[in-house]
Amino acid sequence: MGRPRLTLLCGVILAASAFTTPALAIDSADPLANETTAVAPAPVTRTGPSWAAPQIASVVAAGLMGPDVASFRPDDTLTREELHDAIVALGRPHAAPTDPTRVVTMRELDAQLVAAAGLLPSARQIRLAAAAAGLEPTDMLGTETVARLLGLRTNHPVGQEDLERSPKQPASRAEAAYSLAKLRLLDPSRIEAVRQVVATFSVPTLGEWQRLVLSRALRFVGYPYVFAGTSEKPQTIWSSSAPGNQLAVPGGFDCSGLVWRVFKLQPYDGAPSLADVLKGRTTYAMSGEVKKAQRISPGLVQPADVLFFGTQGTQSKPSEIGHSGIYVGNGWFVHSSSGGVTLQPLQGWYADELAWARRPLAEAGLTA
């Protein structure tokens, strides 16, 4: 997959790493047929060009969406007919929707584009591997992971987290333009690289507590990166640019917020002490809570360990730690970075900059 691009991880800048498509797709025949779409968010009023202006210009020029940029309506919700027309214009076969005016959710948008890339079998492989390990995956686990490995999702800047959308919220035409523009420019070699790396995904035999922790963590794959976010539900975060310094945002997480949600905010039945292990909310604080002698070296990590990444790799100090995640096993972990919450192979930058881990289960006196 190569070295990742520069991206936002937990508030600091780090280096991040043809078949007929059904009218509906997660990774099975028609999983969204009875889905309840979340209420559309209130339009975000901002002056100036859309955040997706370059991608809007790209898809308009390519004939995928809209007759011209001036009439594009970026903040309007996307319909299934519009998505169908765009996929067909890309040259991908796609069945016409039976309910063309129905709004497309974010997770449906991601799934449809993963299918258009020919990677629905890969997405299914991820979900089935997680299910085989007893992790109770959501039906969007595979498609949301593959969409992010392809680079189809983005992160809105700090202070504009209200533009983010959770999986069941309606997709805007701007979000669709961004993803379609990325898909249109994907080199076949990138698609093949994603197919090959997904083929490596597997989960080792897990202990009961590892299974419970990872089941919870994987439930959030597909949620957006929200700076200071700690919940899958709508939340209010502090923002220097918002009225009263309070900004209403959708469900989503930053990197340490995901770890905080998985281990801290909802005690596990039979293990109330696990919620007491983490004391500090930030990655910096979490990484520094374990003495140097108690740090888990990269070669000894186990499922459900919390991973810490720093600019100096294993030589990093707590002050140099800027990212965190939760190890799943067999070279994969789950984290929230610029594309949102996803499964990620421990390769490239992530392998180079993995500093150490801590084992909350053991710290709470629990066996795996």
Residue ranges and their predicted role:
Residues G2-A25:
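Secretory targeting and sorting signals
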Residues L24-A53, A61, M65-R80, H84, ...:
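Feature responds to low-complexity, polar/acidic, surface-exposed segments characteristic
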Residues S58, A89, A115, L119, ...:
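Glycine-rich, acidic and aromatic/proline-enriched surface loops and short helix-turn segments
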Residues P67-S71, T98, P121-I126, P224-K233, ...:
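Surface-exposed patches in mature extracellular/periplasmic domains of secreted proteins
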Residues L83-A86, L109-Q112, A176-K182, G252-L265, ...:
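Active-site-proximal alpha-helical segments within enzyme catalytic domains
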Residues R195-G257, R261-P272, P318-E320:
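N-terminal capping segments
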Residues V203-L214, W260, Y268-Q347:
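...with weaker cross-activation on analogous glycine-rich loops/strands in unrelated enzymes
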Residues A351-A368:
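Low-complexity, Gly/Ser/Thr/Pro-rich intrinsically disordered linker/tail segments
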